[in-house]
């Protein structure tokens, strides 16, 4: 689907729009690049006109939305669907034909961020947590062994202060990760940004 199988590191870079500089929330768009800055694809939230814009301002990351993921040839290959939820957010990943690949499911936790990566049958493939002493680091574990990691990178003082522009390093630490698992880890980076770093409704 995306050229991820032979990659050790992938960067997900959020692209900001003018409205973000004045505190006005705009749709999410991301570049997906390798560690040399070569584009592997991109992802973009689908705008739903004026109603979508209003819901974004009122509901933030609780709202229903779709993110389309494209390959290097700008062909839509995946869709990440976020259903409306106030609690325990979820991101469902499927092919453009509608075949489910898996999901990212938030779990209850007191002092740290926690979610699971599920396969198409709802079975847990990877467990993910962010240590309380590393709030920008998310470790992906399979059977008590770390196999991947997503880390939020510093975007610069001005961008951090005035916009939601976030950059993430996705590290595939286990060469045995399947193509499906790599796609889900990449999708989890989008989930992390939307859930933990996007401005919440009303702010």
Task: Annotate each predicted stretch with a short phrase.
Residues 1-66, 70-77, 82-90, 96-101, ...:
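Low-complexity or membrane-interfacial segments used for flexible interactions
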């Amino acid at each position: 689907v995306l050229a991820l199988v032979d990659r050790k590191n992938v960067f997900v870079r959020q692209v900001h729009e003018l409205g973000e500089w004045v505190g006005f929330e705009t749709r999410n768009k991301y570049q997906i690049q390798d560690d040399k800055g070569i584009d592997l694809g991109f992802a973009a939230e689908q705008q739903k006109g004026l109603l979508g814009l209003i819901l974004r301002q009122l509901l933030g990351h609780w709202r229903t939305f779709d993110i389309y993921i494209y390959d290097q040839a700008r062909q839509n290959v995946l869709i990440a669907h976020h259903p409306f939820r106030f609690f325990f957010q979820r991101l469902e990943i499927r092919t453009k034909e509608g075949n489910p690949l898996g999901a990212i499911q938030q779990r209850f936790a007191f002092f740290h961020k926690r979610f699971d990566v599920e396969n198409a049958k709802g079975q847990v493939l990877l467990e993910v947590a962010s240590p309380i002493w590393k709030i920008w680091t998310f470790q992906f574990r399979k059977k008590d062994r770390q196999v991947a990691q997503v880390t939020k990178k510093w975007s610069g003082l001005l961008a951090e202060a005035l916009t939601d522009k976030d950059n993430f390093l996705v590290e595939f630490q286990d060469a045995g990760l399947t193509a499906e698992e790599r796609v889900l880890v990449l999708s989890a980076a989008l989930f992390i940004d939307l859930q933990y770093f996007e401005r919440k409704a009303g702010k």
